[in-house]
Amino acid sequence: LRKIKDIAHKYKLLEPIIGGDTRHESVYNALTFLKKDAPEFVLVHDSARPIVTKKVLENLIESINLNYTCVIPILPLNDSIRSAYNNEIHEVVNRQDKVIVQTPQLCNYKELVKAHKNNIEIYEDESSLLMSKGIKIMTVEGDPRSLKITYENDFKLLEPYLTNNSKYITVIGNGFDI
């Protein structure tokens, strides 16, 4: 931790904040650390998503003036969804209004602190915590490359994005359906 603090000092970064046992505790620790110089907005990102694109950040930042407390990147859900337990399918879920939620999530600092303050429930992310308090959440376009590392095999999916990309070329073409 000392070495990380030294690096942060050298590059004039905020010093690292010790996380908690849960996401809620870790985010709250970070929010508390920022209290002295409270920003208007914060971006909360989980380290399980190592790829954040400039476009997603631009989408979030451009939305600041739209008077939402929280803005999140989303992707449409392409796969079929089912509810299953005990090795049986029990329900077909309509995917038409379902989306994949990503991070970073842009939140109003004061509202997020207020939501975290006396909260004992566990929420998957900041948008679900704020929604539980009756706050409407805005969405912007996410990026499919912002994969979440949950299982060991997920690292293999990320390899093309994290290794030398010189073997990849950009090809632009036109096409049409007949």
Give the location of each predicted region.
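Conserved core of the sugar-phosphate nucleotidyltransferase
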Residues: K3, I51-V140
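Conserved N-terminal catalytic core of the sugar/cofactor nucleotidyltransferase
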Residues: L1-P39
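Alpha-helical transmembrane bundles and membrane-interface segments of multipass inner-membrane proteins
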Residues: K136-T139, D143-S146, N153-D154, L158-K167
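Short aromatic/hydrophobic "clamp" motif used to bind/position activated sugar donors
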Residues: V42-L43
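RNase III-family endoribonuclease catalytic core
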Residues: V56, P160-I178
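Active-site-adjacent loop/tail segments of enzyme domains
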Residues: I18-D21, S47-V56
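Structural signal for short hydrophobic segments within the conserved structured cores
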Residues: L14-I17, V99, M138, L147-K148
